[in-house]
Each structure stands twice: as structure tokens, then as C-alpha cells.
Amino acid sequence: MVKTQRVVITPGEPAGIGPDLVVQLAQREWPVELVVCADATLLTDRAAMLGLPLTLRPYSPNSPAQPQTAGTLTLLPVALRESVTAGQLAVENGHYVVETLARACDGCLNGEFAALITGPVHKGVINDAGIPFTGHTEFFEERSQAKKVVMMLATEELRVALATTHLPLRDIADAITPALLHEVIAILHHDLRTKFGIAEPRILVCGLNPHAGEGGHMGTEEIDTIIPVLDELRVQGMKLKGPLPADTLFQPKYLDNADAVLAMYHDQGLPVLKYQGFGRGVNITLGLPFIRTSVDHGTALELAGRGKADVGSFITALNLAIKMIVNTQ
């Protein structure tokens, strides 16, 4: 890395395990400066509950970034709206969570931070606070005015991107259009090259229907939409294989020769990845004008403040973000 960079972290729902994980993350050295967008008392109280040392130093945007030393974090303060009891949701803190996301996103857009790592949020509390909120991905897409973003989850062994995300099954076939596939594959291909350092990405593409349509006998979306798009993109030089039946694609003879899989919908691709690497996976938002990774788990309210939360996914998310920073320099 040419110079030390700053990575901003949002712990997510304050009553959940996000603050625990951030405190655990701070117990080791990092080659980047970790700037945590959070309430100071929340972090120090949670560190005390876990019996872990934590020193907060103020964020100074005009000073050079410094590698993170064990037991310390750089704090970009955002005040809680209500006091927090670990494991107990407070509706007003939905506003606090969104404020941390907005500040972190804006800092990435203005060049303060090289990447953003997000902890788990509780969507219900945010919506109960009167803030329409579908998820991190959609929030950052709108705030950054990105034309289109793509959700990808990854482990050390597997990357799975999604053509559609949080849609009911009944709506998916209509959503798989030539325009959508062109856009999603272009973003996936571009970010695999620029953010992952893969010169010529090899992408496996799932069919939509069982047996990838069985030649049109189990649905025609492959023939009418997916195959023509893949043929057009192959002419442009992209290395695309498919459409392949999803029930046979996820095996070594295909995956050993691929850099990523494109699934047509959420529950087509993610069960395999989460079975293989739950707790070690990372959620990546492709198509944003900055690097964003996230843990692949929820708020786990029942574990908050008890010292039982597994920091593995957060560590993986941060390590991946650091690699992506290096690839983009």
C-alpha cells in the first residue's frame, strides 16, 4: 500500500452485536486507520461489558492517516437518540443508525475514506422510526446517485452476484430483462477487474428455470433473454459460461474455472454460499463509486454484550476491503 488509508466503519444496530464486533476488531493491529462512526459511550460501555481494552482517539481529517494499533479506534462521533441496553431495541435509535450510514457514505464520496464496512442493522426498527429503509445496498445506491448497483456475496472460495435481490418469486421472471442483464454483467465484469484485480474475469451464469429451461420445455427465459444477452457480451470479449442449471453449476468442475457466479435471484445462489461459509462470508456492493463491504449476518440481539459474538465475518470484510483498496491504487 502506497500510503496509509482510512476505512470507515458503521457498527449498525446499537442494541445488537455490531458494537461488540467493532470492539473485538480493535483488539488487533491493522495497516489502515479504522474510523468508527458511532456514539462514544456506546463503544466504551460495550468494551467494558466484554472486558476488553479500548481507547478512542478523535478523528482528525486534516492529519495523515495512521495504521491502527491494538486496543484503539478513531472515533467520528454520532450521538445516540436514546440510551442503549444490549439486546433491547429502541425505536428512536433508527434515526441514529441512518445518520451513521449517511455520514460514512458522504465521507467516502468526498474522499475522506477509502472504503466503508457496515455492521448489521435492524430494518424493522428503522422503518418503525418513520424512515423508509429497504437495506444498506439500496440506501447507498440512492445516496451516491449510482446508476445501478449489484449485490455480491463472497467467501475465500466463492463469489456469487445476484441479477435480482429482494423480490418476491412471482416477480422475478418479469424482472429478468435484456437491459437488466446487460447492466448487471457489465458492473460485475468491471468491478472484478478494477476492484478484485482479475484481468479477464470468468463468469458462470445460472439459468432462471429448472434445468435452465430444458430447451424451452420448462420456461423460455433462457432462450428468449439470457442466451441472446450472453452471446452479445461474448462478442465483446467477456468470458461467460451459461446459462447453466443452478443445481449442477455449484460443483468443482465449473467453479474451479470461474471467478464468479451470477445467480438470477437471491435464494438461487446464496444458500450454497452460506452453507459453505456462513460466518466467513462478506457482502459487497458493486457499482458504487467507492468500496463497500459488510458482514453476512444479522444483529443477533440475544448475543449482544455477552462476549459470544463471532467477529470472523467482520475480519473477512475488512481484509477484503483492504485488498480492494490495494487493487484500485
From Swiss-Prot:
Entry keywords, A to Z: Cobalt, Cytoplasm, Magnesium, Metal-binding, NAD, NADP, Oxidoreductase, Pyridoxine biosynthesis, Zinc
Cofactor note as given: Binds 1 divalent metal cation per subunit. Can use ions such as Zn(2+), Mg(2+) or Co(2+).
Annotated SUPFAM superfamilies: Isocitrate/Isopropylmalate dehydrogenase-like
Any GO molecular function: NAD binding
Matching Pfam families: PdxA
A GO-annotated cellular component: cytoplasm
Cofactor: Zn(2+); Mg(2+); Co(2+)
Binding site residues for a divalent metal cation: H166, H211, H266
Enzyme class at the top of the EC tree: oxidoreductase
Gene3D superfamilies: Isopropylmalate Dehydrogenase
Keyword Acetylation in record: no
Record bears the keyword Nucleotide-binding: no
Residues that bind substrate: H136, T137, K274, N283, R292
Note: The active site is located at the dimer interface.
Record's function text: Catalyzes the NAD(P)-dependent oxidation of 4-(phosphooxy)-L-threonine (HTP) into 2-amino-3-oxo-4-(phosphooxy)butyric acid which spontaneously decarboxylates to form 3-amino-2-oxopropyl phosphate (AHAP).
Subunit architecture: Homodimer.
Protein name: 4-hydroxythreonine-4-phosphate dehydrogenase
Organism: Escherichia fergusonii (strain ATCC 35469 / DSM 13698 / CCUG 18766 / IAM 14443 / JCM 21226 / LMG 7866 / NBRC 102419 / NCTC 12128 / CDC 0568-73)
Phylogenetic lineage: Bacteria, Pseudomonadati, Pseudomonadota, Gammaproteobacteria, Enterobacterales
